[in-house]
Design a protein with these regions (language model features):
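Active-site rim helix/loop that mediates acceptor-substrate recognition in acyltransferases
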Residues: 1-23, 29-40, 44-50
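Conserved acyl-donor/pantetheine-binding loop and adjacent beta-alpha core of acyl/acetyltransferases
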Residues: 29-64, 70, 80, 119-126
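Conserved G/P- and acidic residue-centered "switch" motifs that form tight phosphate/ATP-binding loops
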Residues: 73
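Conserved GNAT acetyl-CoA-binding A-motif
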Residues: 79, 85-99
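Conserved active-site alpha-helix within GNAT-family acetyltransferase domains
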Residues: 88, 100-124
Length: 133
């Protein structure tokens, strides 16, 4: 996402960003809007105003970690927190898309692959993953 897109997302659903710091440095974050839509479609990435605070599904748009902090469990801790928060908020579950090579990673958290996503975001083949409570 661009700086402008992230700024727009923060303005619309800042409470759906999970952040990890090392001292004063942001080292990892997970973010995504809430919606009643069951599938993660490209228009959701493009328009932060589609966020519905009372929606059934927590979407995960980004799982980001600085290179020096990768493979230390940072992203996993944030994903677990996002899952716990979605459960506590009474959501039906979470939905994300990922590349084929990461399907097994998200499966460790209980996400199930639903196959190739309708999303063509960034010109990439994405797999939709869902964790249902």
């Amino acid at each position: 996402a661009t700086r402008e897109e992230l700024s727009d997302r923060l303005a619309h659903y800042g409470s759906h960003f999970w952040l990890m710091f090392d001292g004063g440095t942001l080292i990892a974050f997970v973010d995504g809007m809430v919606t009643d839509r069951a599938d993660l479609t490209d228009d959701l990435y493009a328009d932060a105003a589609l966020h519905d605070a009372h929606g059934a599904w927590q979407m995960i748009f980004g799982v980001n970690t600085l290179p020096d902090y990768r493979r230390h469990g940072c992203a996993g801790q944030l994903i677990e927190r996002a899952i716990a928060d979605a459960r506590a908020q009474g959501r039906r579950g979470l939905v994300l898309t990922c590349k084929d090579r990461l399907v097994h990673y998200y499966a460790k958290f209980g996400f199930v692959s639903e196959g190739v996503s309708v999303s063509t975001h960034g010109g990439v083949v994405w797999y939709q993953m869902r964790l249902t409570f």
